[in-house]
Amino acid sequence: METKTLETLKQELDNLFHKFFEDMKIDEKTGIVKDTNKRFSGYPYIGEKYVEAPVKILFIPLDTGSDELYKDNTYHKFDGRIKQITPKKDAKHVFNPHIAGLYATTVCLLKEKLDSAKECWEYLDKAGGKTTSTKINNSWKKLNEEQKNLLSYVAYDNRYKFVTIGRNYKSGGKDRTWLNKDKERELLLSEIEIFNPDIIVFQGKTGLDNCNVKNKEKYTIFKANHPSHYGSGANKLDYIEKIFDKKEGFPKK
């Protein structure tokens, strides 16, 4: 099968979203769903090296934890999502706890495929601090540009596609609901087929339940707690390696 270019991948997803917007009566400009208090939460993140990655990894957390564009009452497309994930040079913390977990999980999955990821994992493992976020902050100045940009090899999406209009807090639990369960699930399944990943990592306790991934045998599927979940220890580096000891099952703390 011919490998898709990044632009082809984006175009196929864009076409899929246009159809979804029509079916759900979503305003293309704002993302607001007609006659509701809900707005489309945004396009998925696609790293610029995803299609050429030695192993294609797709992360699927439950929902967007922070509605970045609530003040503008609109949503991120592909470029906006990239900018949102890219670390700010003057930021006190490199990543928020969720993206820190995403980054460290990416490094773990790629460390047998890329020398840059292997060395990066060693830096993180030796760094001071208990949480993944702290270890990344303490290692960041030692990393080269390739290591800092390892998220460019992966993609991530959300299972739940809508946020409440005007929501200005980070907790995403309120928006783990469906407007049209069948259409939203079909959208996610179609996205997975277009992404055609080698590995899918579902994040959150209900991330994989009842998802009915088509042609599951094509993928290696893992699931884990949300990477910022303190109660499960998911915010620690040693939790990440445990994820991959057990497919489709949660690692123990």
Please place each PLM-identified region on the residue numbering.
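C-terminal capping/extension of enzyme domains
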Residues: 1-15, 28, 170-190, 199, ...
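A polyanion-binding, active-site-adjacent surface
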Residues: 2-195, 199
